[in-house]
Amino acid sequence: MKVNSTTEIIKSLLECLSKEISNGEDEDTMITDITELFNLSKEFDVRKEISNKHNEFLNILMNYIIKSTTANGDNNEKLFKFNLTSIRFLRNLCANVSENQNIIISNSNFINFIINQLINENNNIKITLNKKNILTSLYQLLINGIVLNDKTQSLLWSNIYPNNLIILIEKYKDNDEFKLLPTNLMLIYNCILNSKDRMKDLVCNKRLVQLIIELIKEDDTFDHEYNTQNFHWIHLISKSLFINDLFIDLYKSLSDNKYSTELVKSTTESTTESTTTESTDSTTDSTTTTTTGKTNKNQVKLLNLLDSIIHDGDKKNIKEYIEKDSIIDLKTCYFMIDELASLYNLDFARKDLKVETQQLTTSLNQSDFDAIFFFIKIFANITSYTEEMLSLSLSIFKPNQIPTKQQEGEEDPVNQILNDPFSKDSAIDPSASKKFDLNTLLRKKGLVAICIGSLHGNYGSDTNKSSSSSSSSSSSTTTDGETVTSKGFNKNIESQDKGFKIELIRILGNLSYKNRGNQDEIRELGGIEIILNHCRFDVNNPYIKEWSVFAIRNLCEDNVENQNLIESLKVKGVANNDELKDLGLEVGVTENGTIKFKNVPKKEKENNQ
């Protein structure tokens, strides 16, 4: 019965639409008919029947909307009401019926009409509820027309990317009285969903990605609900890009300058050259004028998004090892270490300045320091293995066993991958993840040296001591033959978040858990001594003691060399015996003067957090 009534209503409506000039009575009939169709379209069977029998009617209706709007604008209230209801009717027809989606989105004249309406809406016209409703309905029609339909997604994307999308965001980003930006972001999300090509299109357009990330407001107290809606869709867009291995491209696209690591390489070279007998004036000038840093606020926002997805979404696995519950791959991990190292080197290039000048200046900006903090937080989470990652690591890679030395003349296969940190995109051998567990690869890439270098810098409860510590640096060779230059950053990141040093120690604790190679390198780079120095209560950083105890316990597990080092530090008065007991360790001296090292009962805690 409903199908018959639908057919009769459409027939009646077509008679009115076919008249070149309509009178008031015709307009009333049209409104009645389209309202009935709108109500009927809420049922799937009706939507399906219309797609099978009334294709031509849909095209006639769309053409009428274009013609009447162009001729009358908003002056005819009845036609305006008819058009609004027609748009809502078309919107409903698209729900779960791909045939209707194809008919509507394939009508290029109608799609261009919608886009022009959204872009050219006169902001000088008094805002009315009707105007808001019709613009919102147009957006909803576009979204319903592309949901789960790759064909219509491609058609619409070709019409709106990139210029129209940029115009739409720029139009409303500073004055969105209609609250349309969240719907705009929803449209972008549905366009790129399940299409890596369209995701790449989005990421490659620098202006577009900047506009999207800029919509994340640091202070959303003015309109919390509106900003929350924007953030929700930006979060979903970003997550889709991360899952499809586009974090690196997105991060580079957000850069203020042409992205390259050559800047870091050249500053390192100039620093080396300054040790010669030639004048260092030019080197000094180049470093002191580098005040703009490397990172910007949009990149920091992106890192914050990645950190929240990994931490709050519990996406700590790495794709090459376990794809389930993963958001990034090994290449992204390496890229983030390269970014950390480049920021270190950028600031380290100032070593030829006077100590007093180093204390008062920096080559890094505030966003650089914020980026450092988020990189460290991310590594603190991904080095904390999930149960699946831990089981895989111990059963396949066995990092808890004493590493065997490479045969003489045989190069470490990972060094073959990592020996040129300035190679384009730090190309990664896919087989690396089949030879070593994640935490071993991160150590070989230099993460241990970076963390210990930071702890040797000017952070922590003793940051107000002699300024000589602020210029301290260390150049060490890892157990894998790589030379890593590291230096503590000049700026005290703990002024923003006292958890920075905790995250560094947490990383070292995670890396050393049941991993003999990592345990040894931390000892060789002086990490044990500095971690022991934090095994005491710090009123300015109350949880650092617990994390330091956690790290020392993991460092000493099945590692006699590390245990012996702590014994020797106890004799020198460096280690606190009470703190060692918290670790389940006790150091004493026998009657003949030899050191006695034994285990004592300790509280059970999780080994890897």
UniProtKB/Swiss-Prot annotation:
Intrachain disulfide bonds: none
Range of residues in the leader sequence: none
Superkingdom, taxonomy of origin: Eukaryota
Gene Ontology terms: cellular component: cytoplasm; cytosol
Bias-annotated ranges (Low complexity): 266-292, 466-479
Region entry Disordered, spans: 265-293, 405-426, 461-490
Protein name, per record: Ataxin-10 homolog
Lineage summary: Eukaryota, Amoebozoa, Evosea, Eumycetozoa, Dictyostelia
